[in-house]
């Protein structure tokens, strides 16, 4: 039986590819998709969800837009990474359908309420919508199997020296998620920076030759340009968000450790840092499965295999 998931995202090139991977995988049943502000403004990320589902001919999936700003802060966006539209590069179709007439939290709550079994929430942007759901609907916590997030890092940040972008945008929301008591799986930079797509991988995807694989290759063409900056020391581009979906499909590709994670909300230099108690120094009980390594070639092979679904 397919695993029911609810996807909360802020497309974003890697979010878009996570959507492609999820909808090419019969093991997963995508119940709804909600959008958050992050990689671009809330209007643009919502539109990008609709554009991707139009491309994939999955306009049957309910969509709703989420919070327009973080819980306690002003919005920061990553337009320097993802371009003016949030999905610069390919020529994507205009949406042929409209979002639901409700908020992201309302759609999430409805989805959980109506599901016969607990739902896995996959969150690949800031955690604002998920935190609002948890705070406003404590009666639905038991309907959440786990929360799989792309965010954080045990080591270096990518937006500040200490913080990864998604967590930095709304650290208060991320702290609510980590301390919720619901199982959390964290795909942080420690693993996503190893999940790099190289130029030859992009050409492999392009050679598959269907309209979706071509769009994915064009998304990666744009994404690779940003990551050529020598400061990163990358061979390719880290494909952050699809790690969440890949872990659900093939957890054997990943190495995880069980650790306690907290989010720094006050630090002068460390706001948004995910503090991972790797050596069990706090005495706190582990609250997250933290991904620390990935079989890069296996990850690329999984993407290539699933892109053939769209032939």
Swiss-Prot record:
Broadest EC class assigned to this enzyme: hydrolase
Top-level taxon: Bacteria
E.C. numbers: 3.2.-.-
GO biological process: nucleobase-containing small molecule interconversion; purine nucleoside catabolic process; pyrimidine nucleobase metabolic process
Sections of the chain in a coiled coil: none
Cellular component annotations (GO), alphabetically ordered: cytosol
The keyword Hydrolase is assigned to this record: yes
MF term (GO), any: uridine nucleosidase activity
Active site: 240
Disulfide cross-links: none
Keywords recorded for this protein, A-Z: Glycosidase, Hydrolase
Family the UniProt entry places it in: Belongs to the IUNH family. RihA subfamily.
Job of this protein: Hydrolyzes with equal efficiency cytidine or uridine to ribose and cytosine or uracil, respectively.
Protein name: Pyrimidine-specific ribonucleoside hydrolase RihA
Gene: rihA
């Amino acid at each position: 039986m397919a695993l029911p998931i609810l996807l909360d995202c802020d497309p974003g090139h890697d979010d878009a590819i996570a959507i492609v991977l999820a909808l090419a995988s019969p093991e997963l049943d995508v119940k709804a998709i909600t959008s958050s502000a992050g990689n671009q403004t809330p209007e643009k990320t919502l539109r990008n969800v609709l554009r991707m589902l139009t491309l994939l001919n999955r306009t049957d999936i309910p969509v709703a837009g989420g919070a327009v700003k973080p819980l306690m802060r002003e919005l920061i966006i990553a337009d320097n990474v993802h371009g003016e539209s949030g999905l610069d590069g390919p020529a994507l179709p205009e949406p042929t359908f409209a979002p639901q007439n409700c908020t992201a939290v309302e759609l999430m709550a409805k989805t959980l309420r109506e599901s016969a079994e607990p739902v896995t929430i996959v969150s690949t942007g800031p955690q604002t919508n998920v935190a609002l759901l948890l705070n406003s609907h404590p009666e639905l916590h038991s309907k959440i199997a786990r929360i799989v997030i792309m965010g954080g890092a045990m080591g270096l940040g990518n937006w500040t020296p200490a913080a990864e972008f998604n967590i930095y945008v709304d650290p208060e929301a991320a702290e609510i998620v980590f301390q919720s008591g619901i199982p959390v799986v964290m795909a942080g930079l420690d693993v996503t920076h190893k999940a790099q797509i190289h130029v030859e991988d992009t050409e492999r995807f392009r050679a598959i030759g269907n309209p979706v694989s071509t769009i994915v290759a064009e998304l990666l063409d744009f994404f690779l340009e940003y990551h050529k900056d020598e400061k990163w020391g990358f061979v390719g581009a880290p494909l952050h968000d699809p790690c969440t979906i890949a872990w659900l499909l093939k957890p054997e590709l990943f190495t995880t450790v069980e650790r306690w994670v907290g989010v720094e909300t006050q630090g002068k230099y460390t706001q948004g840092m995910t503090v991972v108690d790797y050596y069990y120094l706090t005495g706190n009980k582990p609250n997250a499965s933290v991904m620390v390594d990935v079989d890069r070639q296996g990850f690329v092979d999984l993407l290539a295999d699933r892109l053939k679904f769209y032939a």
